[in-house]
Amino acid sequence: MTISYTYDVATESYFGFFKVLFRWKGSVWKLIHRELFMWLVLYYTVLAIYRTLDEERKKIFRSNIEHFINFEPSILTFMLSFFVTTIVQRWNNVFTNMGFIENAAYAVSSFMKNGEDVRRAQRTVIRYLVASQILVMRSISIKALRRFPNYESIVTAGFLTKEESTIIQNTDLSYDSSCVPIRWAIQVLRHQYRSGNFFSHSVYRATWKEVSDFETHLSRVRKVDWVPIPLAYPQVIFFAVRLYFVICAFAKQYFDLDDDDARYVIHYYFPIVTVFQFICLMGWLKVAEALLNPLGEDDDDFEVNFLIDSNIYTGMLIIETSKPPPLKPDLFEDRNFGPIYPNNITDQSVGQALCGSVENIKLAGKDASIEVKKNGENNPPA
């Protein structure tokens, strides 16, 4: 599911930070808590083993890890920044191309004449578009595949008839199954155009373009799934970050605490700085892992099934409510009818119009005469 925290940060406040920080679902704590626990076990295991060694072996142990003590994660930060940027761009590309039905539904419902046959054709076009979306999503999203494991489930849900399902299954769909319902939708529109049910050729073309754009968006999402980021790139990042913290389990130890090192006593028992690094770097990496495939089943992955339901019901609603109510006078015809707010509204911005930064600066009176002159060659503009 998508975890919403927008209301918690609607107004900046001191406690708003804690509301977001102590969330569990979709949080960085949920992403890293297992690996942080495993790392702490490794850290204290190394410390316990060191305590069992004699002095000579302790010296050998310390000499072997001295090479890693000053190793800093700056290169990891550099690598992670590029990797996460790439992942977020792909995530945004998937989100903007998942297929939202509104534009196509508005075009289909607005540019055609009224009539029962036209209404049925409009509803059929919407159903075909959503059926095409289902065929795409069930090939790239495990959530959609669990809901529609076969064509019979699509028929049962009402997105296809048995006859339509049979035709699709009997078609060679080795490369793309979603093209068939899209083609049917275009054919329905074409038949309605030939029957004279479109107001003009230009609006028919506009409707056809919206249907085509819907298919284009679905095609882009499918291609993102087909061609992921080259495997070597995430392998390097995943391996490098985890290897760094394995090294830290040895190199960031405070093995012996002298009297002069009393200020480090807390680090002797708990590696605060290294744990902070772990939360930041490993959390950053886990964010990238979660966004790498936003159509999976993580807490913050996209709600594919909700989008399918929203598209079919919203599209049908737009078709059924395309006829507006009778036109009547509105209250705003009275120029003295001002903005109305409930009595309990205390918004400080009420009555404060947004305006340009120098709009209220008066350099001359309303009717003042301004002396002007022509800009000549010897008097260039400033």
Swiss-Prot record:
What is the protein's given name? Bestrophin-6
**Which keywords describe this protein according to UniProt?**
Membrane, Repeat, Transmembrane, Transmembrane helix
In the UniProt record, what gene is named as encoding this protein? best-6
Signal sequence residues: none
> GO CC terms for this protein?
membrane
Regions crossing the membrane: 29-49, 68-88, 231-251, 265-285
Family indicated by similarity: Belongs to the anion channel-forming bestrophin (TC 1.A.46) family. Calcium-sensitive chloride channel subfamily.
Q: Which InterPro entries match?
A: Bestrophin (IPR000615), Bestrophin-like (IPR021134)
Question: Where in or outside the cell is it found?
Answer: Membrane
Question: One GO molecular-function annotation for this sequence?
Answer: chloride channel activity
Task: State the taxonomy lineage.
Answer: Eukaryota, Metazoa, Ecdysozoa, Nematoda, Chromadorea
According to Swiss-Prot or TrEMBL, what is its membrane topology? Multi-pass membrane protein
